[in-house]
Amino acid sequence: MLLAGAIFVLTIVLVIWQPKGLGIGWSATLGAVLALISGVVHIGDIPVVWNIVWNATATFIAVIIISLLLDESGFFEWAALHVSRWGNGRGRLLFTYIVLLGAAVAALFANDGAALILTPIVIAMLLALGFSKGTTLAFVMAAGFIADTASLPLIVSNLVNIVSADFFGLGFTEYASVMVPVDIAAIIATLVMLHLFFRKDIPPTYDLALLKAPAKAIKDLATFRTGWIVLILLLVGFFVLEPLGIPVSAIAAVGAVILFAVANRGHAINTGKVLRGAPWQIVIFSLGMYLVVYGLRNAGLTEYLSGVLNVLADKGLWAATFGTGFLTAFLSSIMNNMPTVLVGALSIDGSTATGVIKEAMIFANVIGCDLGPKITPIGSLATLLWLHVLSQKNMTITWGYYFRTGIVMTLPVLFVTLAALALRLSFTL
């Protein structure tokens, strides 16, 4: 287990620190090659791992391409300007609406899209309103926080969700029926915590006249309009076609192709730039990283965790839910949520849990891996990239500040969200 653990730690360090600009895909590939050479994993493990990650990574890339195309069309800025007008000049209402917009974007376009696309738009809008640096920081932190805490409701809302749903064969409707009400509880808890934490930084009023008209944000009307149609078709497709055996990735890919074709025909959007901006390295990263994680499984780590989960399972639904959720949240915060979700899934699969207890553990693993990364900056790749985007905007958030904020806000929200899950599953007993 020591060798497998050492390879895993080396891989995680390379992925997080990215020395000399080394891409996450190549870092994970190096780890996978070391695992293969050392015998920690075997050639036969490659197709097993690929079967776990292919649908998840393809779906994620398609959703991000859709997000980038809509962003270039002005879709998200248009939405942000509209919700800012709904605030009617009241600071707390504006704060609430920006958070709710972030929740909606996270649900439909994944947490990465919400954090990375909305953040620059929010910063630009707040600068136009003449807000102070402290106020801008409050809004930006809120946008970044809700992107993860509200990425629970749909399979496509987070790469973690897709991996877990694929691993356990959860259908789109089956997943949503459990997690949509849980997500609502998470959003309410997040709103309460954000308002409490940043209460002194939210201005009482703002001047609506300083905002530009939402229509002026639209750069490509055809892509903007098609985006609405694609979104509706995607949601219908996910709920109707996925139960028929059509992969979520295929449905998302069709949506991306339609929107790309419209954008490419209009020439207002640099579609080549959009394709270059898509996270292609996530394919190599997922395969490489999960091969390294599979090495931990082969070395017996997941067997040990399965033993811990067995103890929790014996104590009933609530203990299993809270125990699994807090365990995977902690692991996500120290070793990144992408490897953690597979470690959790393998451990649950190897446990003796059955029925609603196993179901609780599966969803608690997702919650822990979605929310746990907010405790530390290294918890998710999206957070690291988000911090980099902020530094480019002359808004540096130190790791110390992030950790202090993250731990105070995440733990109560995690508690409420896991309680909501246990309550939701109590109705299926």
Curated annotation (Swiss-Prot):
Membrane topology: Multi-pass membrane protein
Domain of life: Bacteria
Keywords recorded for this protein, A-Z: Arsenical resistance, Cell inner membrane, Cell membrane, Membrane, Plasmid, Transmembrane, Transmembrane helix
GO BP, sorted A to Z: response to arsenic-containing substance
GO cellular component: plasma membrane
Protein name: Arsenical pump membrane protein
Molecular-function GO term, any one: arsenite secondary active transmembrane transporter activity
Ranges that cross the membrane: 21-41, 46-66, 98-118, 121-141, 178-198, 228-248, 249-269, 274-294, 316-336, 407-427
Cell location: Cell inner membrane
InterPro entries: Arsenical_pump_ArsB
Function: Involved in arsenical resistance. Thought to form the channel of an arsenite pump.
A Pfam family that the UniProt record links to this protein: ArsB
Keyword Transport: no
